[in-house]
Structures are given as structure tokens and as C-alpha cells.
Amino acid sequence: MHRRTFIKAFTLSASVIAMGMSFGVQAAETIKVGIMHSLSGTMAISETPLKDVALMTIDEINAKGGVLGKKLEPVVVDPASNWPLFAEKARQLLSQDKVAVVFGCWTSVSRKSVLPVFEELNGLLFYPVQYEGEEMSPNVFYTGAAPNQQAIPAVEYLMSEDGGSAKRFFLLGTDYVYPRTTNKILRAFLHSKGVEDKDIEEVYTPFGHSDYQTIVASIKKFSTGGKTAVVSTINGDSNVPFYKELANQGLKATDVPVVAFSVGEEELRGIDTKPLVGNLAAWNYFESVDNPTNQTFVAAYKAYAKAHKLPNADTVVTNDPMEATYVGLHMWAQAVEKAGTTDVD
């Protein structure tokens, strides 16, 4: 090889190596954050906004200098409302993408699917939705409400004079761990208040269920036995046909109020809510909270939606799990700053 050719080849190789080192340094200058929410399937209606608000929050943190002097880099995956796929995506985020933390899941079945992966790989999950309790892990931050913070106070209200003095309870939910465990807790609570089993009805439907004609008719029949309330733990897009059927059959809140634990502003955005006035939802947060902090949060999300051309950007809303995602991301960022490291331990 001629000396000039050798020098050119050496220079080219050195440049390629330097470029590789540069890319490696650039990669090391970011902190990867996993976002694991269903962007398709039956839970997409509820989970997609959590992805959006997580990305907004990351932009907000990065605009203020990031964390430990590094920008946050989001890694978004779509488990597609498929519970085993949640576990696969969690393993991908932790093992391949090397994220420092994951914000994700909605249903308890998805959380229970990923929990062994986070404990095996010592990952960190922030879970933003109400849950049934009876679980604790050093690898999970549960930022939603447990039954004693949401379900029991809501039912106590329904039993009060202000809440309608309900004597009978129709417990309607999607068929998985959260509704069944919550209703087991509620049944025990109702027993302690003197409510007998004959005055408690439990009905469960699959994820994605869309025909509520027979169930709403059953609610109407059950309500003839005394003052009745419905406690709904329906999840995902099934909420839309359920509330539409209530309106179709003329079941008003003044006759049989419905209190929901898994429906908020987002799930009701696409239906006519006028016939549903008086029905209830129980959450830690609502968009209508009137204080400067929330006004800033809501305005920021609406501006983000328009700037990023999110679907129906002019009518976007905020809800409890979105607020919990926002708070959770800031909480994690502040903890990392204080600890000086992203290490889970």
C-alpha cells in the first residue's frame, strides 16, 4: 500500500471511529425514559392521553435543563391492550433500550403482567391509575388511589342523604382483577353497614364489551326492589356504549345514579352527556379543580395538543391518571436530582 493511500485509509478509519465515539457520547448525554401505554386496542381511548401528557412533561423538564444536566429521551412502545405483550415491552425497555424508568400501564392486569419483569431486572415503574391495593413492590410507585381512598368514600356518599340514600347496589365491572377485588372489598364494607347479599348484584363483562342493552334492563329491574345505585368499574372504550345505553333506556341519575371509578373527561368526550347529568365519578383529580397550579397545567396541555396537532386538539381534556403521570414524572426527576443518580437502589 502506498504511503498516501495508507494515510487516507487510516484517516477514514479514525474518522469513523471518532464518529462512533461521538454518537456514543451523545447517547450517554441523555437519560432514556420509557412510556408504555396502549395506543391501540380497547384501552387506547384511556391510555393514549397518558402518553401525550408524558411527552409534554418531558419537553417541559428538558426546557428547564433536563435532569442531572442531561436531556430526557422518551422511548415510546405500544403494548396494544395485550397483557402478555406488556411484559415483553417492559423487558425490551429495560434490557434493550436501557431506560432509567418507565411510566405506564392502566389496568391492574397489565401491571401484574409486567411486575415480575421489573422485579427481576430491578427496573422502576410509575403506575398512574387507581388500583385494588393488596400489592406492594419496591419497584413500583403507585400514584393512583386505593379502594379506601376512592371506592369506599364514594359508596359512603351514595348511602348518605346527600348521595340519595341508596339501599341496593349494582356492581358492574370489566372482568379482571381490579373490579373483582374492589367489589370484594365493597361487598364486605356494605355487609358492615347492614346491606344484605340480596341487595347486592355483581355483573362482569369482557374487555371491549359493547352491548349493554340486557345489562341496563337488569339494572332497571333490580332497582324496583328499593333505592339503587350503580357502582361502575368498567374500563376502556366499553364506557361509551354503556353510557349511551343508559340514555337510550331513559335511566336517569335521579332514579338510579351511577358512580364510576374508571371513567373521566376523556372517555365521555365523544358522547352526548346531557342525558347523563347527575351521574358521578370518583377520582383524586378533575380538570375543573380551580387553583393556579391546575390552570397552568390545563393550559399547558391544551397548548401542547394544538402545537403537536393531537387528534381533536381543540377539545382535549385532562383527567386524574394524566395528572398522576405529570406529577409522577416531576417527582421522579426531583428524586434523581436529589440522589445524584438514576440508579433504582
Where do the model's predicted regions map?
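N-terminal export leaders
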Residues: 3-7
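N-terminal signal peptide c-region/cleavage motif recognized by signal peptidases
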Residues: 22-24
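Signal peptide-proximal N-terminal region
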Residues: 28, 52-74, 164, 192-197
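Extracytoplasmic "Venus flytrap"
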Residues: 34-53, 77-84, 106-109, 174-180, ...
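Beta-alpha junction/loop-to-helix N-cap segments that form part of ligand/metal-binding clefts
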Residues: 45-52, 65-135, 143, 205-213, ...
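Extracellular/periplasmic Venus flytrap/periplasmic-binding protein
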Residues: 88, 139-249, 292
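Periplasmic-binding protein-like
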Residues: 93-105, 126-128, 168-173, 225-236, ...
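Extracellular/periplasmic periplasmic-binding protein-like sensory domains
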Residues: 246-326, 336, 340
